[in-house]
């Protein structure tokens, strides 16, 4: 089974989650966050096959849109809401992102998806 995410359909992490919902779970309600995406990719919910190929079209556009500007936005939000034990780690990650260093939101997502042996991720530029 193949699913196709279209990088032209999202400009930020929240819109990425909406695209995942549209493509992988056909608009069914899901929590639309990093942990829920991890759970969804792990499978066992009956929403998607246990093994599948995920094609991410316009990946280079996504790399730009989910780059350091979006990473700073996400980490700033996390810093406001994070558990006190995560405060220093999040602050350091934000500091790095403000300098254009460290992993971006795009990197977070690629790593998360790639950690699932049941998912074959293909990053494709263009259609």
Q: Each PLM stretch: what is its role?
A:
Residues 1-127:
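Positively charged, polar, low-complexity stretches
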């Amino acid at each position: 089974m193949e699913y196709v995410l279209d990088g032209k359909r999202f400009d930020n992490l929240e819109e990425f989650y909406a695209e995942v919902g549209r493509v992988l779970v056909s608009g069914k309600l899901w929590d639309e966050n990093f942990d829920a995406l991890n759970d969804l990719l792990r499978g066992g919910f009956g929403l998607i096959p246990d093994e599948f190929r995920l094609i991410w079209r316009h990946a280079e556009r996504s790399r730009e849109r989910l780059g350091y500007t979006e990473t700073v936005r996400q980490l700033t939000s996390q810093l406001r809401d994070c558990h006190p034990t995560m405060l220093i780690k999040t602050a350091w990650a934000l500091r790095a992102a403000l300098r254009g260093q460290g992993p971006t939101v795009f990197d977070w997502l690629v790593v998360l998806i790639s950690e699932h042996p049941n998912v074959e991720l293909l990053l494709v530029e263009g259609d």
